[in-house]
């Protein structure tokens, strides 16, 4: 064991030894002699003595250890004391020697004072010169250091170094150094260019011009999972870097002792161990010095910047975090004292940047439509051969209403001289080009081109008519909708950046201003002095200062509402072009005078964009425009927007789309949602609720109404509403007035559309009038306007009601025109009308078994009809009947069409309670789903722009059907909103009244046909007056009037089954068989003589009627059987008598019929007088 090793006492072992000895041996009263005697007397005394010996040995060992430990400590104390005395003696000798040297030094100073002062001054000069040279060397490295920091996007450090460098160059020591003049000028120029660069960086980030800005926008959401995760990583990295910096600041580890400060641990160290520790510490210190010398030299200016800048971390790229990046840029501008001018430059660039973004979006949308060959629906009322520069309202009033407006007279489209115009504007039912369909399909002489035009014109005629499906189809492939989606999406991101940047700028400007005011305040306090305490000053109560009041007085320089106003202004100017708003400055025509005084045409109105429309296309076949080549660029390599038009001298346009006031319908809800969304965002960010001075409000019961009494309309919203009031509504009224007049006044208005053109689109295959289809097409278009602009329901509803009422008046006039000259009109205006209405109400029910007894209505009907023919002096003329089958089918088609129109109008415009509940449930489900999506913090990616190729079509369909994330304000109205439902409820009563009018007129047409066919029976059976039944030879052919009646009823029944449903046809012809049976008996009054051949002829008439009218008299043979049996019995007297005695009773024969039969037998003498007496007796018993 080493002698220098310090020994320690083992207290545990000592305690163990002592505890092993019994307690009685530790007591002071221990009697050793008695204990020894007891041991000696004990039988096991030997064992006891051995045990006592062991105890003694253990105690001796521990006693020796205790003595050794204390003796070693005593020796060390004596040794240390001797060393101390030795050090004290050495120190005393050194002190005496130092005192002698001090005396010698004082003597030298007294004798050489002047020389020492000279050396001291020279030393100061050298020191300051070296310091200046060091500064110059550092300043020469500043440009490279600036470029390094700027390249790494560490602009705050760059700004600090730049400002500190210029400040250093302007110090008194360096201001006159000629070698630094060029550097000073370069840094000043660098400062100005650096300001511009910072503003450009901010602009690029705001308008998402770089990939980094787009990525940064995705992570800026506070609820984004990746953003939070990134913040955690950055905080950990910062903590690690801080720890590393802290450890680097101390050159020696904390456990290492300095070689110049020996430690005393309570015991003297040997000389060898001390030298060993000193050598290890020296080696470690040298290694630290070498590592520091190998690191790059840090400039003093750089150290100053790092100590003053706590926001910027040099280890990360700040551009990955948008908010941090903008904060650092603003901080750099603050260092450069360029905040307010930068705000002015940024606000001044908004208009230019938005115009550029709009132009790029226009070009992109146009190229997408070119490359993908999308088909675009036409404007309502536009014909396929409309000119490129014509107004949208001319298409409906002057041309045959093809496309979505209607059809022309002969049911086909007007031909065009252009080789592509015949099929270019037609849209296939399944979205394919008509040229593709026409290759594989032929229907007679008609091509699928015309069929597709009809299917496109009446796209509402689907098998399952659904309101939401109809609305969803309104925004398919509308370029202006896609353009606004892209612009609104871009503007939404840009405006969010502006909001963040405005808050950062305003806070920085406010802090800077408060700092300036605080400095002024402190300066005034110092110059004015304490003065004296005021009476209002109390101890412990802080006195309000001017600095605190100044916080309220500082206004925001970067006004977000001004940004929003500029954005709305630029979008408004773009919309003016696409809405054909001639009040726009962009489209205004200003005449200019040439130097010679003549008027020039340079101010002629011209379109500014290559993309100029939404709904409309002139000549577009889905793949190529006739006026544009396959490439959207000009032959000289320039784009279509930059090409020069030879006629106007201005920028040429790609003539695919046409501006129209109809474009306001699909974009109005988008604008409303967009403006409401950004207004709400602006209010939430600024915390200043806006109020409005206007008191006009729209009354709705929903909370999400577009018009709120407390909301202020922005510039864009005011413009679109003003445009609707000023132009759009009047344009709609005039346009629909012209189109309506054309639809109801054309020669084809009351002709049905060909059946084969509707059978593949309608589950109900009954033809419908052309005018009815066109009127409902108008209602469809106006209904889409109502849904898009629900708070204009009064205006659009008035147009719908006026159009429907005018059509009702036209149909009523047409009905009266056909019915008034006829006998049907006389019967239709009597009390018979209400009986027939009751019969019509139950006609659709199950028919009972045929009965001979007439009902009260049938008796009344038969009486009124027969009275028309009981006046020989007033014979019925042929012109008092409607024998033209086309007129009869027109009445039938009008009845079905008006009833169909009434049902469709009610289905479209009347909101049922179950539908309203369904909409409410759907909205609640959507809100719950949206809340669940918002509660889940998952990363979301924004769709910037429209993809090219096939992906854009899929994304376009997805965007049309759904709305996601922050783009909820951009979207289509695939479902009716609560506002639209409430708006439609205001129209319920007028629409129900109009629908009832249509149904009443439909019933009048049906009743008129029923009466007309019964009058036909009376008219044709009047032939009995001219017929002769004293035939010399047997005749096998029926009477001519029977043949005519057969032909008339058969043709009518065949045509009516095409135009009317089975229940209505049953109502028309249900009583014909019974009526003819009654007439075949009642007309016997005109037969004065008859022989057996005449009887055979009568039987032939009945057989012919029964055979030819089988479709009409299904299950009604009983009415013809009794007549046939009666006629056949006329051949034999006995058979006749037996038959009449058996059958002459009610209800088989009525009293009137019995009287007519007896009179007929008396005149013709077919039986004996006795038989007649027998029959008369039978008649009396009836």
From Swiss-Prot:
Q: Which domain of life is it from?
A: Eukaryota
Q: Where is the composition biased (Low complexity)?
A: 236-250, 410-426, 921-932
List the GO terms this entry assigns under cellular component, sorted alphabetically: cell projection; centrosome; exocyst; Flemming body
Pfam families documented for this protein: Sec8_C (PF20652), Sec8_N (PF04048)
Q: Where is the composition biased (Polar residues)?
A: 933-968
Residues of the region (Disordered) are: 236-262, 376-427, 525-545, 921-968
Keyword Protein transport part of the UniProt annotation? yes
Q: Where in the cell is it found?
A: Midbody, Midbody ring; Cell projection; Cytoplasm, Cytoskeleton, Microtubule organizing center, Centrosome
Q: Where is the composition biased (Gly residues)?
A: 392-409
Q: Which UniProt keywords apply?
A: Cell projection, Cytoplasm, Cytoskeleton, Exocytosis, Protein transport, Transport
BP-aspect Gene Ontology terms: contractile vacuole discharge; exocytosis; Golgi to plasma membrane transport; protein transport; vesicle docking involved in exocytosis; vesicle tethering involved in exocytosis
Identify its protein family: Belongs to the SEC8 family.
What do we know about how this protein assembles, alone or with others? The exocyst complex is composed of sec3/exoc1, sec5/exoc2, sec6/exoc3, sec8/exoc4, sec10/exoc5, sec15/exoc6, exo70/exoc7 and exo84/exoc8.
In UniProt terms, what function does this protein have? Component of the exocyst complex involved in the docking of exocytic vesicles with fusion sites on the plasma membrane.
| Listed PANTHER family | EXOCYST COMPLEX COMPONENT 4
- Any idea what this protein is called? Exocyst complex component 4
